[in-house]
């Protein structure tokens, strides 16, 4: 079985896959809060506890981290606890199969690369990926699977938290759809601004991408959403076509399999 590890600023998501290629299947996933102070031993103890009896069935590990301190500990953990199985950490120098057509490829987050790979694999054409995480990323992928760049905006939760913490008369509210756009109390007003406002933000960015890039103006372009807040925003969006909850885990699986195939052929993995 393949263990996939997706470390972000807010959460760590683990996914357990059986099979490979078209026969692969995500059997189970787990979520935990990210603690940038966690050591390699603490990470391994937590992961092994979640995996339970599956821990001895792991035949490979693929991981990414957008948190530098955790990335270092992930590397140590893999060597110490899973050094006997093939493992891949997505970072510069690792082959992903995604050409990065940007000014500085090393600046592109591993999560954005992996999402782009999975989206193009699933929909086989030009696509726009919207990841609702700590930040809101809108990434543009060509029909050839090239990463063309994108947009980064604050995330839904971090925006509402900042609003509450920086405003004396406002407090943190539950992020749910309000009764209407026109709120009748402060809580509903904040919920309206968050839910409908972010739907408008995403729609605006997607439409601007379509206007700016002629090849993204047609009906063959797939707009795919992922991330914890995606199910809340999608019903209010006019541009998002698909929800792929496990997009990043699927991308990690693809990166692992591509690197294994490369090693099996005797060729050295390249970016």
Curated annotation (Swiss-Prot):
Taxonomic source organism: Rhodococcus erythropolis (strain PR4 / NBRC 100887)
Main location: cytoplasm
Disulfide bond entries: none
Top-level taxonomy: Bacteria, Bacillati, Actinomycetota, Actinomycetes, Mycobacteriales
Protein name: Type III pantothenate kinase
Catalytic activity: (R)-pantothenate + ATP = (R)-4'-phosphopantothenate + ADP + H(+)
Keyword Metal-binding: yes
Region forming the signal peptide: none
Subcellular location: Cytoplasm
Leading EC class: transferase
């Amino acid at each position: 079985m393949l263990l996939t590890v997706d470390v972000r600023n807010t959460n760590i998501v683990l996914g357990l896959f059986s099979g490979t290629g078209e026969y692969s299947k995500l059997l189970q996933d787990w979520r935990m809060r990210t603690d940038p102070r966690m050591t390699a031993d603490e990470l391994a103890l937590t992961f092994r506890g979640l995996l339970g009896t599956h821990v001895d069935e792991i035949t490979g590990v693929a991981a990414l981290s957008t948190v530098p301190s955790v990335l270092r500990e992930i590397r140590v953990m893999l060597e110490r606890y899973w050094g006997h199985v093939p493992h891949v950490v997505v970072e510069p120098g690792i082959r992903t199969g995604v050409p990065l057509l940007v000014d500085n490829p090393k600046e592109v987050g591993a999560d954005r690369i992996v999402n782009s790979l999975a989206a193009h694999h699933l929909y086989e054409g030009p696509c726009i990926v919207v990841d609702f995480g700590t930040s809101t990323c809108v990434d543009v992928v060509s029909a050839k699977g090239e990463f063309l760049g994108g947009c980064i905006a604050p995330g839904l939760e971090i925006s509402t938290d900042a609003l509450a913490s920086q405003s004396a008369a406002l407090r943190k509210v539950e992020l749910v759809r309000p009764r209407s756009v026109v709120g009748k109390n402060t809580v509903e007003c904040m919920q309206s601004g968050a839910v409908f406002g972010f739907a408008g933000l995403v729609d605006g960015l997607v439409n601007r991408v379509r206007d700016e890039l002629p090849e993204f103006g047609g009906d063959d372009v797939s707009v795919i959403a992922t991330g914890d807040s995606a199910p809340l925003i999608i019903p209010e969006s006019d541009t998002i076509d698909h929800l792929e909850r496990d997009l990043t885990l699927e991308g990690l699986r693809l990166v692992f399999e591509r690197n294994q195939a490369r090693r099996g052929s005797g060729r050295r993995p390249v970016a």
